[in-house]
Every structure is written in structure tokens, then in C-alpha cells.
Amino acid sequence: MKVAISFIGTNKYLDYLPQYYENIEKYFLPNSEKTILAFTDGELEDTPDNLKVYHQEHLSWPYITLKRFEIINKAREEIKKNDWFVFIDADALPVATITEEEFLDRCCGADTNQVPLFGVHHPCHYLKMPPHLQGTGAYETNEKSEAYFDVSTLPPVYWQGCFWGGKVPSALAMIDELQARVDRDLEKDIVALWHDETQINKYFYEREFDVHTFGPEYAYPEVFDQYC
């Protein structure tokens, strides 16, 4: 199995790359052929053969996160060489082995052709922490936004933007669509409430049967260890 993994690390976030690379190689899909796609404004020398570097200027907040779909698309041709695309935040680390069997497992007898996308249940939503499960939750309520969500009934899952992806054709379709939605919002001077994460949640909710949801134990901060 060939897997492309996206690392966006501009400015000081590039400092996370050495540990990120080491942990990905050691713990994440250990029997797969992995390529790390590093988007950065920093200088990298003597990089491993499976680390591909793409120049990316640092953008002010929140655009460095909001425009991540556009950033990732710079590596489109490299992504196409793989079976799976995975996004993992620069400051997120696998700390225990995630096997191929675990990663590819799907509920209720389904397979990855039927459920080609994946996300992770936000641990703060799981723990019912504010603003989740209160009022309008963490959803965009501006009807003019591409990420607008009818909050009359809040969904049972809110996905965190730190860990998501899918089989390459489905993942690229998602990246293209969300890049277009972000651009249309920006043309109207709209930034969704939680930026790229808000856009991801709208997209996943529209396709909930195409999305496998990993539990919050795949995304929690160390301080949540006793809860997840």
C-alpha cells in the first residue's frame, strides 16, 4: 500500500518535522510505502528519499490553516502516485503502532471502496466540552457561507481537522471541492467559524456514509489521557 502523508510546517512549525517524520516511520502503517509531503518556507537539506519538499510561504492566521486544501493541491501529481492520502497536523504524533489492518477496518462488513474517506471524532466534542453540544455548537451559522450548517439538530459527531484523508480519488475530490468552497467564501469576505475544520465537517456530514470515523483516542492531547 502506498500512502502520501501531508505535513504543513511553515515558520516555527517546521521544528516539528524531525519528530513527526520519525514517529510516522516507526508507528504509522509500518508495512506500507510512505511519502511525506512537506510544505514549508524553511530550508531542508539531506532529506530522506521519501520526503518531498514543496515551498510554501507562511500565511497569516487563519489563512495558513484555511487554505490548506489549496496548499495540498501543490502536490497533486505526487499524491496521484499513491493509494491513500492522509493529512496529519504538524503538531500531532502517532505514539503507538497503527497497523494497516486497523487503519483499513470498516464497520458493519463494509470495505474501503464503500467507505473511502476517514476522519476523527474531536475529543472535545466527545467529552461534551464547550462549545460542543451547546446552542449552535462549533458549526457555521452564516447562511451565506459554503460551510453553513442547519443547527436545528446537531449531529452526533464533530470531526477534528488534525487527521483526515481517504483513498486518493475520493481525497482529491474532497480537496478540490473544499478549495473551491473556501475560495467562494473568501470572495464574499467570509471565513468559516473554525476555518478548514468547519469546511471538513460540512463535507463529511453531506457524505456521512462515505466516512469512517476513528475514535477520539486517535486525536486527543496528552492532558486528556484519562478521558479518551
Which residue stretches match the model-derived regions?
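A conserved donor-nucleotide-binding helix/loop in the catalytic core
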Residues: 56-88, 95-96, 195-205
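Catalytic core and acceptor-binding pocket of nucleotide-sugar-dependent glycosyltransferases
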Residues: 145-228
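Short, solvent-exposed loop/turn segments at secondary-structure junctions
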Residues: 10-12, 42-45, 58-59, 92-94, ...
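Catalytic phosphate/metal-binding cores of nucleic-acid and nucleotide-processing enzymes, i.e., regions
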Residues: 15, 19, 71, 79, ...
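N-terminal anchoring/stem segment of glycosyltransferases
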Residues: 1-67, 74-81
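Short catalytic/ligand-binding loop motif for oxyanion handling, primarily in non-cytosolic enzymes
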Residues: 15, 45-47, 94-97, 102-103, ...
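A structural signal for short, well-ordered beta-strand segments and their strand-loop junctions
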Residues: 37-38, 86-89, 94, 165, ...
